[in-house]
């Protein structure tokens, strides 16, 4: 073989070796697509909390749906939903006991706390007796419930005479929601005890609504 031919062959061998080394290095550095993707944690999906849909827990009591509440027995739905409704009314009334300017509004607030606390205890007794161990069944789709969600931050921030009018506006709306659900229970409840409580709620809270509206008419502009 001629020296020139040997020189060309040597160059070709060197180039071939360099190419093989480069390919090997490149394939060693590459990772499968799935491995690269799995090395980074997935960004968690943003989910709305119950408080974001029904109120802010930092500013007061909030109401929310329980999972599968609509398939629970109606009387259990009423007990759990009205109990939650009562708890929010009690919280509002306790704020009024401390901040209301009119003595008669403070007295009403105390009566709301006392009467609804008694009803809460009665409903808990029934729940323990009739539905022991059953999961919570708060159903915000029952009549009057969505209208009963209150902005506790607004009530907390109100002062002076404006507080009294704000409380009246919120509590009359809240009571109206309770009356709507109680009337529904009068027609649909299975237990006579629930029907009787429902009538009691309708009668008591309608009277309180009427009284608050009279006060509002007398106090506006004074």
Regions found by a protein language model. Name each.
Residues 14-19:
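Hydrophobic helical h-region of N-terminal Sec-dependent signal peptides
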Residues 20-24:
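C-terminal motif of bacterial Sec signal peptides marking the signal peptidase cleavage site
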Residues 30-222:
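All-alpha RGS (Regulator of G-protein Signaling) helical domain and cognate RGS-like helical scaffolds
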Residues 26-28:
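Bacterial signal peptide processing site
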Residues 2-12:
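Bacterial N-terminal signal peptides that target proteins for export
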């Amino acid at each position: 073989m001629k020296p020139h031919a040997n020189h060309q062959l040597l160059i070709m061998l060197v180039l071939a070796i360099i190419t093989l080394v480069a390919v090997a290095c490149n394939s060693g550095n590459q990772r499968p697509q799935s491995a690269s993707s799995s090395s980074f944690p997935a960004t968690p999906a943003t989910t709305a909390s119950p408080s974001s849909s029904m109120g802010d827990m930092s500013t007061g009591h909030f109401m929310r749906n329980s999972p599968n509440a609509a398939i629970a027995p109606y009387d259990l739905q009423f007990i759990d939903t009205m109990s939650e409704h009562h708890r929010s009314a009690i919280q509002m009334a306790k704020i009024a006991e401390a901040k209301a300017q009119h003595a008669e509004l403070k007295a009403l607030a105390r009566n709301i706390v006392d009467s609804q606390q008694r009803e809460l205890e009665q409903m808990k007794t029934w729940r323990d007796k009739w539905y022991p161990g059953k999961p919570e069944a708060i159903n915000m789709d029952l009549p009057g419930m969505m209208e009963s969600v209150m902005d506790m931050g607004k009530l907390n921030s109100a002062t002076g005479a404006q507080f009294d009018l704000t409380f009246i506006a919120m509590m009359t709306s809240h009571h109206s929601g309770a009356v709507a659900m109680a009337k529904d229970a009068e027609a649909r409840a299975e237990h006579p005890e629930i029907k009787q409580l429902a009538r009691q709620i309708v009668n008591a809270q309608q009277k309180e609504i009427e009284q608050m509206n009279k006060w509002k008419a007398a106090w506006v502009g004074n």
